[in-house]
Amino acid sequence: MNSPIAFKAAEQTMWRLVQRYTGRVGYRRGVKSEGLSLSPPVIDCSGWTTLLLTQAMQAENEATGRAVFSADDMLALHAWSDRIIEEIGTRTGFILEARKITADTFPRYATIGLKMGEPEWANNHPRSRGITHIVQVVCSPEDGAQFVSESYGGSVSPGISLTPLTEWLALSENHLRAGEMWVVDPFRLASKAQG
């Protein structure tokens, strides 16, 4: 469950972003981080995940004074949900498919892609593995507790939310059983950058 490197600056940065925006930002499909400056602020799932990851990776680079994460890897995260999963999985050589996802294999800062039905908009934009939603696992710097942060457009409390990981996994059990969940570890990009 734990990553081999602590990534404290990354962890703290993601947590600060989550604390700042959870419950205060709505959801709008196709809107990335620029939507945070709108009134009211909005962002979609891939925009939120990209913001969390790139800000965390930049913070880790600054804290260490070196390129722990490459600019090319961070740039590749500016994509749709399926492409983010594809890029991280391809670049790290690590992707867990539903049946291989367990407490023992789950990365500390997992990025999770889900196939959430067959939305009409996806007909014109085919998705790798059918992934139409993405979420990011973040950890509380105080106690290490894992949470899922996501921007979601559902009918209940749309926008950025924060859910304890165990609760989120229980709510997502049907996706896991149906083989509609994929997990990657974006922080494995660090070992790639360091050669």
What are the residue ranges of the model-derived segments?
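N-terminal capping segments
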Residues: M1-H78
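Low-complexity, Gly/Ser/Thr/Pro-rich intrinsically disordered linker/tail segments
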Residues: S151, T163-G195
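...with weaker cross-activation on analogous glycine-rich loops/strands in unrelated enzymes
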Residues: G65-P158
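Short, solvent-exposed loop/turn elements at domain surfaces
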Residues: Y27-R29, V156-G159
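N-terminal compositionally biased, intrinsically disordered segments and leader/signal-like regions
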Residues: G23, R91-G93, E167
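Generic structural motif
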Residues: A10, S81-D82, L96-A98, A178-V184
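Low-complexity, intrinsically disordered short peptide segments enriched in small/polar/basic residues
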Residues: W15, A145, S157, A178-M181
